[in-house]
Structure formats: C-alpha cells, structure tokens
Swiss-Prot record:
NCBIfam families in the record: rpmI_bact (TIGR00001)
Protein name: Large ribosomal subunit protein bL35
Organism: Deinococcus geothermalis (strain DSM 11300 / CIP 105573 / AG-3a)
Family: Belongs to the bacterial ribosomal protein bL35 family.
GO molecular function, one term: structural constituent of ribosome
One of the record's GO cellular component terms: ribonucleoprotein complex
Keyword annotations of the record: Ribonucleoprotein, Ribosomal protein
Gene: rpmI
Keyword Acetylation: no
BP GO terms, sorted: translation
Length: 67
C-alpha cells in the first residue's frame, strides 16, 4: 500500500500545538499591506485555536507529517 501524502496546503495553514490543539492563522497579512492600518496588520498576526469539532478533520490532513 502506498504511503499517505501530507496535504501540503494544510501544513501552510494549520499547526498542531504541543498539547494537541489545532491552531490556524488569519489570512491577508502577506502582501499589499500599505493600505491597511497597523491595528489590522497586527490583528492578523495572531493565531487562533480551531473548534474541537474541526480537529479530527485537520489532523487527518497532517497525518503523513507525523503529528
């Protein structure tokens, strides 16, 4: 049976914390920031913990990564 590949898009959007929670980050901070206020850019830098109901689906996408 072939190896299960990691969903590379998942590894860029989501990470698993040391306690096993799934953390995501807000979009819209990478480029074209000149028109945005500093508060908006700083607010997008913070990650947030996803709801528990989403964890199993997200971890399945990261399965091949060994997390």
């Amino acid at each position: 049976m072939p190896k299960m590949k990691t969903k590379k898009s998942m590894t860029r959007r989501v990470k698993v914390t040391a306690t096993g929670k799934v953390m995501a980050f807000k979009s819209g901070k990478r480029h074209q920031n000149t028109g945005k206020s500093g508060d908006e850019i700083r607010g997008k830098g913070k990650g947030f913990v996803l709801a528990k109901s989403e964890w199993a689906r997200m971890k399945l996408g990261l399965l091949a990564k060994g997390k």
